[in-house]
């Protein structure tokens, strides 16, 4: 068969038109050194800070040091099989994690991959772990409460939606217990929770997950895990991953709560990475940007206004504000709050709950020291009835502490001083609370009302706990309507005060404790 020149040119033209060029221009480099989870790469000219670098075997590293002739990157996971001379590629994107409602009730690692054996996660998409916090104009003032269920916290150190409240204290004195109870208390409040475990034992995290499940709070919670045995890079990035998952709800006009347990271990992981990258060490061998490490994370916790939510959702959600409340945890050494990381985080947050070893050992749990614990913005968000009733609680405890120290040296005390001491002792006893037993607004209100109005005067100190338990049982069975009204409205007026007084008078007559 012979083809003429026209047919040949048409055929060539057709082939040219159908030809598709599928090429991907990606920068490629070579590993020149591997040690302790850090790789040095030569030849990556246009890599950006924080960019994911593709390694052999479908693994990734993150570029942290951009130097004149090499790039320092930290490997996300095991690095034993990496060798000098291996080829790596830039990806043009920073680390992203899955977000969405499909993550609720699941346990995931830093990268958002499920580790609970419940199958794949149905996410709504991916979001970058590092984003800029909302600006001042996009924020709204904190004026709605987050109930922790602890009398000592909700009455004296109230937390608002969108606040950052630090939980600080030595090891093994109930920091995690307080945060977990706060999560358990949100199971019916509509607040979605994220629990980020950094540098902890796997057995400890398994116990926390089991307790959340037992109390029906896991279905409302995302657990992000970077155990002590995992790479320092994963421990450093875990809080940012959890924050991104919490922001998903905030940006859609919902309320969320995130617990970072704990940021001391994250700072240690970051120090390890920085020293291996040969960055110059500063105070306590931490790098110069360890303040920025925590500030850029905690500034993302905020309450955003309705305009921000409407703009973010492209008009799908209107007239609703969103919030992300943060409870960062910091572990101190021998009660030293003046160390580098504790002072940094205290200055970033909107208040702190200080837990004290001596109080814990004396049997006061939660071991909250009301003298140096403070909430800078939560007062505006406090429930009305708790705010009205709890005004004298902090004062009573502060006076009691002062007088208790003084009375050890005084041989005889006048009646007024003795009355103050006895009242303080009973209020201190009333503030004790069991773990995994968060209290409703009504229960807290009744207990505080009893203390404020002098109903504990005639109760023996060792019977205060029994008195409270019997009182709450009586109120919830005999005056369920009143308790429901308080829980629903949180209001306090002359009618409610009168009803509470009549109910307590009736209970005291029964002498059933």
From Swiss-Prot:
Chain ranges passing through the membrane: none
Organism whose genome encodes this protein: Shewanella pealeana (strain ATCC 700345 / ANG-SQ1)
Reaction(s) this enzyme catalyzes, per UniProt: ATP + H2O + 4 H(+)(in) = ADP + phosphate + 5 H(+)(out)
Protein's UniProt name: ATP synthase subunit alpha
Membrane topology, as annotated: Peripheral membrane protein
Subunit structure: F-type ATPases have 2 components, CF(1) - the catalytic core - and CF(0) - the membrane proton channel. CF(1) has five subunits: alpha(3), beta(3), gamma(1), delta(1), epsilon(1). CF(0) has three main subunits: a(1), b(2) and c(9-12). The alpha and beta chains form an alternating ring which encloses part of the gamma chain. CF(1) is attached to CF(0) by a central stalk formed by the gamma and epsilon chains, while a peripheral stalk is formed by the delta and b chains.
GO cellular component: plasma membrane; proton-transporting ATP synthase complex
Origin: domain of life: Bacteria
UniProt EC number: 7.1.2.2
Stated family: Belongs to the ATPase alpha/beta chains family.
InterPro entries noted in UniProt: ATP_synth_asu-like_sf, ATP_synth_asu_C, ATP_synth_asu_C_sf, ATP_synth_F1_a_nt-bd_dom, ATP_synth_F1_asu, ATPase_a/bsu_AS, ATPase_F1/V1/A1_a/bsu_N, ATPase_F1/V1/A1_a/bsu_N_sf
Keyword Membrane: yes
Gene Ontology molecular function terms on file: ADP binding; ATP binding; proton-transporting ATP synthase activity, rotational mechanism
């Amino acid at each position: 068969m012979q083809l003429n020149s026209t047919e040949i040119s048409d055929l060539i033209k057709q082939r040219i038109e159908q030809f598709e060029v599928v090429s991907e221009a990606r920068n490629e480099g070579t590993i020149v050194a591997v040690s302790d989870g850090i790789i040095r790469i030569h030849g990556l000219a246009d890599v950006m800070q924080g960019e994911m670098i593709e390694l052999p075997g479908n693994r990734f590293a993150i570029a942290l040091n951009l130097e004149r002739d090499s790039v320092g990157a930290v490997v996300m996971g095991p690095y034993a099989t990496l060798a000098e001379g291996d080829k790596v590629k830039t990806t043009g994107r920073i680390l992203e994690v899955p977000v969405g409602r499909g993550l609720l009730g699941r346990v995931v690692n830093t990268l958002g991959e499920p580790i609970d054996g419940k199958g794949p996660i149905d996410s709504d998409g991916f979001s970058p772990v590092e984003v800029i916090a909302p600006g001042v104009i996009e924020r709204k003032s904190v004026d709605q409460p987050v109930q922790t269920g602890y009398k000592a916290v909700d009455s004296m150190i109230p937390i608002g939606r969108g606040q950052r409240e630090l939980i600080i204290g030595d090891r093994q004195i109930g920091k995690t217990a307080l945060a977990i109870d706060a999560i358990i208390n949100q199971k019916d409040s509509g607040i979605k929770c994220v629990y980020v475990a950094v540098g902890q034992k796997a057995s400890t995290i398994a116990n926390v997950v089991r307790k959340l499940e037992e109390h029906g709070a896991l279905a409302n919670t995302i657990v992000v895990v970077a155990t002590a045995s995992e790479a320092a890079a994963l421990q450093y990035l875990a809080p940012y991953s959890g924050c991104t998952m919490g922001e998903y709800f905030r940006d859609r006009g919902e309320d969320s709560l995130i617990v970072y347990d704990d940021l001391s271990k994250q700072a240690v992981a970051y120090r390890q990475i920085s020293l291996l990258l040969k960055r110059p060490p500063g105070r306590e061998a931490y790098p110069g940007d360890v303040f920025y490490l925590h500030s850029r994370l905690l500034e993302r916790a905020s309450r955003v206004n309705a305009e921000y939510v409407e703009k973010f959702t492209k008009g799908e959600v209107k007239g609703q504000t969103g919030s992300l409340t943060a409870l960062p945890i910091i572990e101190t050494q021998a009660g030293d709050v003046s160390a580098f990381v504790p002072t940094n985080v205290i200055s970033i947050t909107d208040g702190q709950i200080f837990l004290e070893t001596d109080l814990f050992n004396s049997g006061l749990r939660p071991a909250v020291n009301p003298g140096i614990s403070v909430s800078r913005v939560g007062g505006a968000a406090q429930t009305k009835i708790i705010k009205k009733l709890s005004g004298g609680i902090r004062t009573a405890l502060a006076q009691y502490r002062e007088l208790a120290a003084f009375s050890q040296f005084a041989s005889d005390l006048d009646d007024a001083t003795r009355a103050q001491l006895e009242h303080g002792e009973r209020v201190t006893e009333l503030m004790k609370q069991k773990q995994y037993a968060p209290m409703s607004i009504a229960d807290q209100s009744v207990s505080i009302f009893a203390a404020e109005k002098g109903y504990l005067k005639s109760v023996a100190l060792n019977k205060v706990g029994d008195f409270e338990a019997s009182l709450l049982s009586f109120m919830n069975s005999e005056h369920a309507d009143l308790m429901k009204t308080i829980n629903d409205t949180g209001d306090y007026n002359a009618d409610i005060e009168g009803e509470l007084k009549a109910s307590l008078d009736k209970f005291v007559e029964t002498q059933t404790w």
